Amino acid sequence: MKFENDNEKQVFDKLSRSLGNIIETKCDGYDELYGHKICKEIGSADEVQQYYNEDIAQSLLFKLCKAYQFNYDEIVTHLVKILKWRKKFNPLSCAFKETHNKELEDVGILTWYPEEEPNKRVVTWNLYGKLVKKKELFKDVQKFLRYRIGLMEKGIQLLNFQDEENCYMTQVHDYKTVSVWRMDSDMKSCVKEVINTFQTYYPELLYAKYFVNVPSVFAWAYDIIKTFVDENTRKKFVVLNDGKKLGKYLKQCPGDQFGGSSKSTIFEQNVKKVKPTAYASYLLERQEIEDVE
């Protein structure tokens, strides 16, 4: 953690001191962020001993401070919103309990590039070209959202919040073969809901977003997406009309499809088995017991 001035450090310290009270009084006691326990004042002594990692907790709090420019009131407002949403929506269930439509799972890919540049090691891919004739998959916005959140949560498990070189994710949106397609109202609703959800509940996690194979869909895809995001996020966007130019930015991506050094296909690179954190597993198991009772 690097503070630019004394004020930033003071805001961070104030948040750390107030966290227990904030969670207890404003978040219904829900103490989990991205699969990690963030407060040592909540829960039993055994839970704290087993699942609380101070370095990770502080790194996550620092991300929140950075996301909201070290404005204490803004940070608290968004932290409360995020934790209450996580308790209600249960994104850990999306990733590690629920079964999603197989056709959707073929569109969302997760890759791990250990030798890649900092914060380009965990990459989520959205292969929109595979959905050209599958518009029915967008009819149920909530089903689509839960699938996409599940992919996001799995990707987060591959991050290391104690490592500044692997504490952000990269995304790729591939629009190959989508040139004659038009975004209907159902897809617009899904795209808007996903973007709004990521903006609101996953701050300071995106390192870069690449839009590839987009010459003819630029107007309706990229421009629409830009409308839904803030300026800081837009600065992380890179648009490539040729998919093979992606290899310049992600050197370990598939060579045949994206110009990288790998001989594997994107589907062969797909990381399908991701383990939740010990704390996430504990919460999911506890939920199962509560559901049975």
UniProtKB/Swiss-Prot annotation:
InterPro entries with a match to the protein in the record: CRAL-TRIO_dom, CRAL-TRIO_dom_sf, CRAL/TRIO_N_dom, Sfh5
Domain CRAL-TRIO: 100-266
SUPFAM superfamilies to which the protein is assigned, alphabetical: CRAL/TRIO domain
Catalytic activity from the UniProt record: a 1,2-diacyl-sn-glycero-3-phospho-(1D-myo-inositol)(in) = a 1,2-diacyl-sn-glycero-3-phospho-(1D-myo-inositol)(out)
Lineage of the species this protein comes from: Eukaryota, Fungi, Dikarya, Ascomycota, Saccharomycotina
Lipid bilayer topology: Peripheral membrane protein
Keywords from the UniProt entry: Cytoplasm, Endoplasmic reticulum, Heme, Iron, Lipid transport, Membrane, Metal-binding, Microsome, Transport
Subcellular location: Cytoplasm; Endoplasmic reticulum membrane; Microsome membrane
Transmembrane helix keyword on record: no
Signal sequence residues: none
Annotated GO MF terms: heme binding; metal ion binding; phosphatidylinositol transfer activity
Family membership: Belongs to the SFH5 family.
Protein's job: Non-classical phosphatidylinositol (PtdIns) transfer protein (PITP), which exhibits PtdIns-binding/transfer activity in the absence of detectable PtdCho-binding/transfer activity. Regulates PtdIns(4,5)P2 homeostasis at the plasma membrane. Heme-binding protein that may play a role in organic oxidant-induced stress responses.
GO biological process: Golgi to plasma membrane protein transport; phosphatidylinositol metabolic process; regulation of establishment of cell polarity; regulation of exocytosis
Protein name: Phosphatidylinositol transfer protein SFH5
Domain of life: Eukaryota
Taxonomic source organism: Candida glabrata (strain ATCC 2001 / BCRC 20586 / JCM 3761 / NBRC 0622 / NRRL Y-65 / CBS 138)
Principal subcellular localisation of the protein: cytoplasm
Pfam families reported in the protein's UniProt record: CRAL_TRIO, CRAL_TRIO_N
Gene (UniProt): SFH5
